[in-house]
Amino acid sequence: TQGTNARVYKFENVFDPTTPGGGQNTGEVSVKSTSVTFDAIPVTNAQGKIDIWMEKINYDNFTQGAWYDGFAKNIENKYLNAQGDALKIYDRLDLIKDENTIRDSLEQLSGSMYANINQREQDIYGVLNNALFTLQNSENNTKENVKINVIAGKGSTKEDTSGVESYDYNTVGVLALREVERTYRHTFGYSLGYTRTDFQMKNTDNEDQADTIQLGLHNKYTVNGWNFRNDLLGRVSFHTNDRSITWYDKTKSDMKSDYNVYGLSSLNEIGKDFEIGRNVKVVPYTGLELGYMTHESFEESGAAESLKVESNDAYSIKPSIGVRLEAEKRLGSESNWKIKGNIGAGYEYELGNMNRQEEAGLSAIEEGHHKLAQTAED
């Protein structure tokens, strides 16, 4: 089948069962296809000799119930008379000898790395939001303040959903916040942040590097112990992905992609301070977070197995309720140094959909796209 793509091949007069003393050529002959995607069918011809018909088995025979079943059907429909890069991919698949390997190869080809683009972006947003919260809750000594938070951390996201890759990540960056007390009730601020986040997909050589810039406008009102807060945030992340396919013969195909993700968020919170001690207070609160995220269409470059990924967007409507316990302690009676901390419990519920299903297409074969695995709801 190498170099050609037909669904049926005929090998004529392969065996002659009537040959006297012919060893394996004598009597009945057992025939088995080496390729898992072809069936070998022996047929006795008019001369009493054995012809072998090699018949293609559909790829989706091996993927029923799998998330990449639609992908398998798409490339099966384009098998006949394929040429160029498409033929190179089919030639590789035709040499696979067992079902586990054909399933693994089809799953790698389909592009599971791109199933959770938005999930990775939300991890970046979470790091920046935590840094902003720390600055906003630090005490202002004057009416105009500039605060800086140096960001360094790591995390891990584990996925139990088939076709969605788990990953570890490291983040470094900085966030600066300038606040101005316009009146004793109203504080206005703006912020600028940058992070570099490196994602490493588990059990693969796939990597995603993201450079993120965030701008923010912030308003806080305080009236009789009540606190009203609004944060309007805009972000853009510049992603560079490296994706690798490891074939059954240990050869690798490497692809690269560049794309941008854009996001907007509005954080709104109302809370009430209750002093329960000189340096301790309880803050029950309720909030509403609104968000929107989108990424553009993009294509990989590199090997024949390169993908094209469809644009996608997502939105968030997330109400929340909770309580925080905040405390501080001065280090010495004359010291200006303090230790501050807070602990809390809260509940939030996502009414939107921040993990809309992604779609991709194998550029050399698919005219359209196939659906990637659906990430689990938060």
How would you label these PLM feature ranges?
Residues 1-97:
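Extracellular, surface-exposed repeat/solenoid domains
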Residues 52, 148, 219, 284, ...:
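Conserved small-residue
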Residues 90-277:
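Outer membrane beta-barrel translocator domains of Type V secretion systems
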Residues 149-155, 193-197, 232-239, 285-297, ...:
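Short glycine-rich beta-strand segments
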Residues 160, 202-204, 240-246, 294-302, ...:
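Outer-membrane beta-barrel and related beta-rich outer-membrane complex signature
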Residues 220, 276, 292, 305-378:
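Outer membrane beta-barrel transmembrane domains
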Residues 249-255, 302-310:
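Short helix/strand-bridging catalytic loops that position acidic/His residues to coordinate divalent metals
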